[in-house]
Curated annotation (Swiss-Prot):
DNA-binding region boundaries: 5-17
Region (Disordered): 1-21, 160-206
Gene3D superfamilies (UniProt xref): Hypothetical protein, similar to alpha- acetolactate decarboxylase, domain 2
Organism: Arabidopsis thaliana
Domain notes from UniProt: The PPC domain mediates interactions between AHL proteins.
InterPro entries assigned: AHL15-29, PPC_dom
GO molecular function: minor groove of adenine-thymine-rich DNA binding
Protein name: AT-hook motif nuclear-localized protein 28
CDD domains for this protein: DUF296
UniProt keyword list: DNA-binding, Nucleus, Transcription, Transcription regulation
Gene transcribed to yield this protein: AHL28
Function (record text): Transcription factor that specifically binds AT-rich DNA sequences related to the nuclear matrix attachment regions (MARs).
Cellular localization per UniProt: Nucleus
Length: 206
């Protein structure tokens, strides 16, 4: 009686069975956003709160719409922390802003901070601009185009001894004032008149 043994190895075709595909989701390093801020809201605080909620950094590329009652940081040679407030309605011409993402506890904070700069067109085509140092309230629906980023790396670029010496001298003469700060002045822009209010209160920091 002849005995037939089982063939050795795997059954024919077993190696060629299709395998389920493996998908790996990788978040892009930068993502575009279009954001809408309704009238009556502080656009700076709205963007800052959005970044904190998503734990991301943000770079605002452009904006459109109108805002009211803007407080700007006065440039040098004004006293550090000096601000000026413009009352009225203004159209956004350009926006440049950066909100840094939250850093890990072990990371050293880079010597930079969040900033928000604007160029605005007021009545009669007058243009003002600078670093925002207080609330920036939307006078209508405001739109922003921005991109997000995470885990930025900080690098200090090489500098010559002369550049370092000039930088140290500039810091001794006076540094740029902080974004929020002290006593400010107030301007009311309406039509072609500009009215100064020397008794204006200091704006609250955002």
């Amino acid at each position: 009686m002849e005995t037939v043994g089982r063939p050795r190895g795997r059954p024919r075709g077993s190696k060629n069975k299709p395998k389920a595909p493996i998908f790996v989701t990788i978040d892009p390093p930068m993502s575009p956003y279009i954001l809408e801020v309704p009238s009556g809201n502080d656009v700076v605080e709205a963007l800052n709160r959005f970044c904190r909620g998503k734990a991301i950094g943000f770079c605002v590329l452009s904006g459109s719409g109108s805002v009211a009652d803007v407080t700007l940081r006065q440039p040098s040679p004004a006293a550090p922390g000096s601000t000026i407030t413009f009352h009225g309605k203004f159209d956004l011409l350009s926006v440049s802003a950066t909100f840094l993402p939250p850093l890990p506890p072990t990371s050293l904070s880079p010597p930079v901070s969040n900033f928000f700069t604007v160029s605005l067109a007021g009545p009669q085509g007058k243009v003002i601009g600078g670093f925002v140092a207080g609330p920036l309230v939307a006078a209508g629906t405001v739109y922003f185009v921005a991109t997000s980023f995470k885990n930025p790396s900080y690098h200090r670029l090489p500098a010559t001894e002369e550049e370092q010496r000039n930088s140290a001298e500039g810091e001794e003469e006076g540094q740029s004032p902080p974004v929020s700060g002290g006593g400010g002045e107030s301007m009311y822009v309406g039509g072609s008149d500009v009215i100064w209010d020397p008794n204006a209160k200091a704006p609250s920091p955002y």
